[in-house]
């Protein structure tokens, strides 16, 4: 973005006897970051101009001039030729001044019945609506990658963990589908947030509305808003829709951070469950052997960044009286960075999941080391009539003996198993295999391979 400086004059300078100092100008200017709203600002202005003509406030000639001038400005902005000026403070006054320079008095009439307060609120909602649509597409791409990988590994057994200790056998596909469900809820939250974002604040003016005979519903239709903000004070003063988005974004990043932690662990030699494609890793400047999972590590780190933006927005709003205050200028940078970080993370993640190489033998070996079928033995005893708490105690003693002798439960001979409970029969060995343990959980939401394949089919239908 290029900026220039012009003699001090502005949309409000007539009230003041001296120009704003240079340091205050730099301190208060938002153009270094709100220039990103330019295309949305032009969209809102064109709809506002069309409405002013519709209600008889703006002539057909002025409307045509505004449309032509805005078209030229849009081309300049997209081509990077627009000269942004700190003296014009923000994106709104920069565009208005440039428009007026092109078309004369018609440009000065554009702001009739409008304030920068409702103008910026409209711009942010247009920006965020577009961002949510892109993020929803990114979530869908990530979910698709998860489903594809889960389908390929519906039968691949791995240890399920609690407290990062081997707990029970699950399939890798089942594990991946847990993240599919988390992202599905994230998508629901984003879509629900979009409904509240998609309300038109324009027409609220500074805070009390306007004396011009405006038609807010007309502008809403022009811009694709589902409804109009019903209270002018609320329309310009609150940013709860941005906070809600930031909260939903923080949850998405939290879910991806958890998956990132697992990818990092699984890629480590101590686990060796997976490998990531080289394009998502880096090396060491001193240790030639290193292949570091930088992308998932950065996802973990950037999650803290997004969480921080949520807190910043909450803190920004908590002490403001109605209506608009300059504090709200500080909403844009955390919002923009949250959108950028989340959109980039989703795009990278969808591709990274497609590049995961799974190592089933390592997963199988790991699940054999932690008595993962102990719960199956307890369930077996319960089905034989033993109360669960007694069954739990029996199996715990059997695990201790097996552990001390370096054996698995399935390696204990029947006569030794019967010393712990005489009701154990030789049919128990079918349940103490990994395959038997998985197959036993053949219900909706369970980890049996048949259920995982059915869940994959349902997931594809939801995408």
Curated annotation (Swiss-Prot):
<comment type="pathway">
    <text>Amino-acid biosynthesis; L-arginine biosynthesis; L-arginine from L-ornithine and carbamoyl phosphate: step 3/3.</text>
</comment>
<keyword id="KW-0028">Amino-acid biosynthesis</keyword>
<dbReference type="InterPro" id="IPR008948">
    <property type="entry name" value="L-Aspartase-like"/>
</dbReference>
<dbReference type="GO" id="GO:0004056">
    <property type="term" value="F:argininosuccinate lyase activity"/>
</dbReference>
<keyword id="KW-0055">Arginine biosynthesis</keyword>
<dbReference type="InterPro" id="IPR024083">
    <property type="entry name" value="Fumarase/histidase_N"/>
</dbReference>
<dbReference type="InterPro" id="IPR020557">
    <property type="entry name" value="Fumarate_lyase_CS"/>
</dbReference>
<keyword id="KW-0456">Lyase</keyword>
<keyword id="KW-0963">Cytoplasm</keyword>
<dbReference type="InterPro" id="IPR009049">
    <property type="entry name" value="Argininosuccinate_lyase"/>
</dbReference>
<dbReference type="GO" id="GO:0042450">
    <property type="term" value="P:arginine biosynthetic process via ornithine"/>
</dbReference>
<dbReference type="InterPro" id="IPR029419">
    <property type="entry name" value="Arg_succ_lyase_C"/>
</dbReference>
<dbReference type="Pfam" id="PF00206">
    <property type="entry name" value="Lyase_1"/>
</dbReference>
<dbReference type="Pfam" id="PF14698">
    <property type="entry name" value="ASL_C2"/>
</dbReference>
<dbReference type="InterPro" id="IPR000362">
    <property type="entry name" value="Fumarate_lyase_fam"/>
</dbReference>
<dbReference type="GO" id="GO:0006526">
    <property type="term" value="P:L-arginine biosynthetic process"/>
</dbReference>
<dbReference type="GO" id="GO:0005829">
    <property type="term" value="C:cytosol"/>
</dbReference>
<comment type="similarity">
    <text>Belongs to the lyase 1 family. Argininosuccinate lyase subfamily.</text>
</comment>
<dbReference type="InterPro" id="IPR022761">
    <property type="entry name" value="Fumarate_lyase_N"/>
</dbReference>
<protein>
    <recommendedName>
        <fullName>Argininosuccinate lyase</fullName>
        <ecNumber>4.3.2.1</ecNumber>
    </recommendedName>
</protein>
